[in-house]
Amino acid sequence: WVIMLEPTRVDDEIDEDIKNVEDMVSFEAMKAAFCIREDDVIDEAVQNKWNAIQKIFRDRSLQIMPRNLKMVKNYCAVGCRCMERDTPATKFAPLDYALSQKILPTINGNGENYRMLIEDLLKECTAQNMPISAKHLERMKRIAENNMGFYQFFSR
């Protein structure tokens, strides 16, 4: 989704009194809560699932960019600390969010290799264990079937 905002004059905003300033969360508090810490670790099951997903991309000769690898790793480490993961559908929640936000949007191509990539990812990311990613993958598969086999995250 692309959000378009109307331009505003910054001067109009500067003189506004901020209500409830004492209730605002500081940037330092946000960093303490959501930035990776030395003691953050990725749960073994989440790491194994991530390794399996990376292997699917490697087997199809499709690269995941190093920057995205690092973002997924850090997101999963913090997510394993912060997220509730006590049901089968939420056990892999950090990876489910990271995959659907950082990796799946990079899929953009057509042909048998991409069809097999989506099929293999759907086997690994099921509606029971990674519902967000599974939903996106199913949508990509369905749209590609009606779009000459072109697989793209942002297709509608």
Regions found by a protein language model. Name each.
Residues 1-156:
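C-terminal regulatory/interaction module of P-loop NTP-utilizing enzymes
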